[in-house]
Regions:
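Bacterial N-terminal signal peptides that target proteins for export
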Residues: 1-8
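C-terminal motif of bacterial Sec signal peptides marking the signal peptidase cleavage site
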Residues: 15-18
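Subset-of-secretome marker
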Residues: 20-217
Length: 217
């Protein structure tokens, strides 16, 4: 008679595991090439970049906005200047950037100026962006799949080629290892998280290929 409760407990545990939906992501050599191809086809995307801690070479605390594959971007950011966090609005069209601080109007500056230390147009650049980075990975370990912001996602621990990564994010140090989540349906990147030395850089994407119109102010 004592076997019945034990059997019931075992069955309940199996049922709970099945209901959790957690399963290992597919092999990386299946997912990453598909993801690289999917990201190469993206016309525009909304992104958010958050920096927790000090990241040498990346003089921003946060950034968000919309970026296009044509080299345009628009949004807001928090840059670090003279030890202070300064919120700015920005527009990038081609080789020109326009930045506006808390007061005053937009100032035209070249892309890469200290007033805009991170160029978000790199995200969809065919040579330096997400797609190129995914093609240049050195190793990737599948982990349990999970939901990210309501999206069913495959999760991987990925080591990227350090040279390719240096083109992607100008952070000094060994930042080329990341946890990356891919949309199970579209293979597009949902989120990437980089950690090193107690600091974290989180990059998230949504609203892929919405209608956008970015013009110089």
């Amino acid at each position: 008679m004592r076997l019945m409760p034990l059997a019931a407990t075992a069955l309940a545990a199996l049922a709970l595991a099945a209901c959790s939906g957690a399963e290992e992501s597919p092999p990386a050599d299946e997912t990453l090439p598909a993801a690289a191809a999917a990201m190469a086809e993206v016309a525009n995307v909304r992104f958010s970049l958050a920096v927790d801690g000090e990241v040498e070479g990346l003089e921003i605390a946060a950034a968000d906005g919309v970026v296009t594959s044509g080299g345009e971007a628009e949004g807001t950011g928090v840059i670090t200047a003279m030890g202070m966090d300064v919120e700015v609005s920005y527009v990038i069209v081609g080789e020109d950037a326009y930045v506006k601080g808390f007061t005053g109007g937009y100032q035209q500056i070249p892309v890469g100026d200290d007033m805009l230390p991170y160029d978000p147009t790199v995200l969809l650049s065919p040579d330096r962006g997400v797609a190129a980075l995914l093609e240049a990975y050195e190793s990737a370990e599948p982990q349990e799949s999970e939901k990210v912001d309501g999206v069913d996602a495959y999760r991987y621990e990925i080591v990227f080629d350090p040279v390719a990564f240096a083109e992607f994010i100008p952070a000094q140090g060994e930042w080329n290892t990341a946890t990356v989540w891919f949309d199970q349906e579209t293979s597009r990147v949902v989120k990437a998280e980089f950690e090193q030395g107690g600091a974290t850089v989180t990059l998230a994407f949504d609203d892929y290929d919405d209608s956008v119109d970015i013009e110089a102010p």
